[in-house]
Curated annotation (Swiss-Prot):
Function: The RuvA-RuvB-RuvC complex processes Holliday junction (HJ) DNA during genetic recombination and DNA repair, while the RuvA-RuvB complex plays an important role in the rescue of blocked DNA replication forks via replication fork reversal (RFR). RuvA specifically binds to HJ cruciform DNA, conferring on it an open structure. The RuvB hexamer acts as an ATP-dependent pump, pulling dsDNA into and through the RuvAB complex. HJ branch migration allows RuvC to scan DNA until it finds its consensus sequence, where it cleaves and resolves the cruciform DNA.
InterPro entries reported in the protein's UniProt record: DNA_helicase_Holl-junc_RuvA_I (IPR013849), Hlx-hairpin-Hlx_DNA-bd_motif (IPR003583), NA-bd_OB-fold (IPR012340), RuvA (IPR000085), RuvA_2-like (IPR010994), RuvA_C (IPR011114), RuvA_C_sf (IPR036267)
GO biological process, one term: DNA recombination
Organism from which the protein derives: Nitrobacter winogradskyi (strain ATCC 25391 / DSM 10237 / CIP 104748 / NCIMB 11846 / Nb-255)
Family affiliation: Belongs to the RuvA family.
Protein name, per record: Holliday junction branch migration complex subunit RuvA
Pfam families registered for this protein in UniProt: HHH_5, RuvA_C, RuvA_N
Keywords annotated in UniProt: Cytoplasm, DNA damage, DNA recombination, DNA repair, DNA-binding
Superkingdom of this protein's organism: Bacteria
Keyword Isomerase annotated: no
NCBIfam families: ruvA
Record region (Flexible linker): 144-154
Gene Ontology CC entries for this record: cytoplasm; Holliday junction helicase complex; Holliday junction resolvase complex
Annotated region described as Domain III, given as residue ranges: 154-205
Length: 205
């Protein structure tokens, strides 16, 4: 199996790069974000590789980091997500953004991926929710609150405060993080207006 390739960029295709390694050109399929980050033809590049062997072909998938490759593998543990869909997700969200979206139950961010419907986005978030926090630098308090919101266990003032921030134009993850921080400072009995005020203060930092 090929685990890493180091060579010179020969050319680019729509969803792949040809990497010249010692005179042999390897066609490596990559996410759009990865392709955009690679250098111009003629320059050196290193890619972590995931090798797929089928009866009729060998296909190489390339990643800038081992961490990105691990996400590629993890995404494919979700029902209905194959290599093509996994690459599309990684083309839309960085590994850090994907981890945060899953940890915060942010289905909308995942659903921005071309070709991903709401049902697949929900499966990704649901099936990977217990694995994502270990990949993400997300405050455990925020993750806990996101879970409470998802299960309708969060107090009404907290839900209303987050909804108010979302209506003001903030994203669901931003609003959840801000109100989680506000809740820690205000205590369990805080009213909606107080949480909104403290949440906006957090967002202005």
């Amino acid at each position: 199996m090929i685990g890493k390739l180091k060579g010179v960029i020969d050319s680019y295709g729509e969803d792949y790069v040809i990497l010249d390694v010692g005179g042999v050109g390897y066609q490596v399929h990559c996410a759009s974000r990865t392709l955009q980050a690679l250098p111009s033809p003629g320059q050196a590049a290193v890619l972590s590789i995931e090798t797929y062997v089928r009866e009729d072909q060998i296909k190489l998938f390339g990643f800038r980091t081992d961490h990105e490759r691990e996400w590629f593998r993890l995404l494919q543990t979700v029902q209905g997500v194959g290599a093509r869909v996994a690459l599309a997700v990684l083309g839309t969200l960085s590994p850090a953004d994907l981890a945060s979206a899953i940890a915060l139950r942010d289905k909308a961010s995942v659903a921005r991926t071309p070709g991903i419907g709401p049902k697949v986005a929900e499966r990704i978030v649901t099936e990977l929710k217990d694995k994502a926090p270990s990949f993400a630098n997300v405050d455990p308090t925020v993750v806990h609150l996101a879970g409470d919101l998802d299960d309708q266990r969060a107090p009404r003032p907290v839900r209303d405060a987050i909804s108010a921030l979302v209506n003001l134009g903030y994203g669901q993850p931003q609003a959840t993080a801000a109100i989680a921080a506000a809740s820690r400072g205000a205590g369990e009995n805080a009213e909606t207006a107080q949480l909104i005020r403290l949440g906006l203060k957090e967002l202005s930092k």
